[in-house]
């Protein structure tokens, strides 16, 4: 019989690929839970070695009562991927009034393919509609490919 470890807490962070260091926000978040920060940083950097530098990855860290941990690396956030596709640094302060850029429907589908793993959507069409809504919420216009 497999004995399950008792979970103490879950920590959600967004960390740049290959760049985990003990400095804030990682150090304080893990230190409060009694986790070996350097071990996490080494493990994270090793597992993200194949990722593009600068890619922001959501990470869910599960801390167990015996102070051991496991972590799951998710796909990059939709907002990060949309901003990268549009070539912008930040979204609009007034998204319904001011547009900060444009994305093509083909880019939306590519992002939806990436995000489909982490989404509750069952098909590409509904995932794409969700990504389109996210694009509009940060002030991006969605254009058809012509």
From Swiss-Prot:
Pfam families, per database record: Ribosomal_L11, Ribosomal_L11_N
Keyword terms of this UniProt record: Methylation, Ribonucleoprotein, Ribosomal protein, RNA-binding, rRNA-binding
PTM text: One or more lysine residues are methylated.
Transmembrane segments: none
Single GO term (MF): structural constituent of ribosome
Disulfide bonds: none
Annotated GO CC locations: cytosolic large ribosomal subunit
InterPro entries: Ribosomal_uL11, Ribosomal_uL11_bac-typ, Ribosomal_uL11_C, Ribosomal_uL11_C_sf, Ribosomal_uL11_CS, Ribosomal_uL11_N, Ribosomal_uL11_N_sf
SUPFAM superfamilies: Ribosomal L11/L12e N-terminal domain, Ribosomal protein L11, C-terminal domain
Assembly with partners or alone: Part of the ribosomal stalk of the 50S ribosomal subunit. Interacts with L10 and the large rRNA to form the base of the stalk. L10 forms an elongated spine to which L12 dimers bind in a sequential fashion forming a multimeric L10(L12)X complex.
Function noted in UniProt: Forms part of the ribosomal stalk which helps the ribosome interact with GTP-bound translation factors.
HAMAP family noted in UniProt: Ribosomal_uL11
Protein name: Large ribosomal subunit protein uL11
Source organism: Blochmanniella floridana
Source taxonomy: Bacteria, Pseudomonadati, Pseudomonadota, Gammaproteobacteria, Enterobacterales
């Amino acid at each position: 019989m497999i004995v399950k470890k008792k979970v103490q807490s879950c920590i959600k962070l967004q960390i740049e690929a290959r760049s985990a260091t003990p400095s804030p926000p990682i150090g304080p978040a893990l230190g409060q839970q009694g986790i070996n920060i350097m071990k996490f940083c080494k493990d994270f950097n090793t597992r993200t070695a194949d990722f593009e530098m600068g890619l922001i990855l959501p990470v869910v860290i599960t801390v167990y009562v015996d102070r051991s941990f496991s972590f799951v690396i998710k796909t990059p956030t939709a907002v990060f991927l949309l901003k990268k596709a549009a070539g912008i640094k930040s979204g609009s302060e007034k998204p319904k009034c001011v547009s900060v850029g444009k994305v093509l429907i083909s880019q939306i589908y590519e992002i939806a393919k990436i995000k489909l793993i982490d989404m509750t959507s069952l098909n590409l069409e509904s995932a794409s509609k969700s990504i389109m809504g996210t694009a509009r919420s940060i002030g991006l216009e969605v254009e058809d490919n012509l």
